[in-house]
């Protein structure tokens, strides 16, 4: 049995603490050291790849950048790193989700992994109509 390790892309900005996970914290808030710029996220992704991580988890939610768009852009600055894209199936149609996933897989040479989530914060779920 081999172990595979994944990293995390801080698409709401990065800081010294992991408490709170970034949920509901605006980019640039107190404690956030680096905003979630494409340049910084590219740096994180390339570092994870160089260190041998298999994939990078990319969160979804109103509090962070769009996981699909960010990871699609990051495929251009990485070679092997896979992207574990979190998405909520109730927010977009199944047909569109399938098309997005197929396009991503084709253009990234098979580097998409999906993390189907239901959400976990009641205020955000209400805002999305759950």
Task: List each language-model region with its residue ranges.
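Conserved catalytic cysteine-centered active-site region
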Residues: 78-84
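Flexible, glycine-rich active-site loops centered on histidine and acidic residues
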Residues: 2-34, 93-130
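Active-site nucleophile and cofactor-binding loops and adjacent substrate-binding regions
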Residues: 60-63, 85-93
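Short, well-ordered alpha-helical packing segments
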Residues: 45, 72-75, 88, 98-105
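N-terminal beta1-alpha1-beta2 module of alpha/beta enzyme domains
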Residues: 1-78
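Hydrophobic residues within beta-strands of alpha/beta enzymes
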Residues: 56, 83, 112-114
């Amino acid at each position: 049995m081999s172990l595979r390790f994944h990293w995390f892309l801080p698409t709401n900005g990065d800081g010294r603490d992991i408490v709170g996970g970034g949920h509901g914290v605006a980019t640039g808030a107190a404690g956030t050291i680096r905003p979630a710029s494409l340049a910084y996220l590219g740096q994180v992704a390339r570092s994870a790849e160089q260190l041998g991580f298999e994939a990078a988890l990319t969160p979804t939610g109103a509090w962070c950048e769009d996981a699909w768009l960010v990871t699609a852009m990051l495929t251009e600055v990485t070679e092997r790193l896979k992207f574990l894209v979190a998405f909520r199936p109730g927010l977009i149609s199944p047909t569109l989700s399938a098309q997005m996933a197929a396009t991503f897989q084709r253009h990234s040479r098979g580097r998409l992994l999906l993390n189907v989530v239901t959400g976990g914060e009641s205020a955000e779920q209400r805002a999305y109509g759950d």
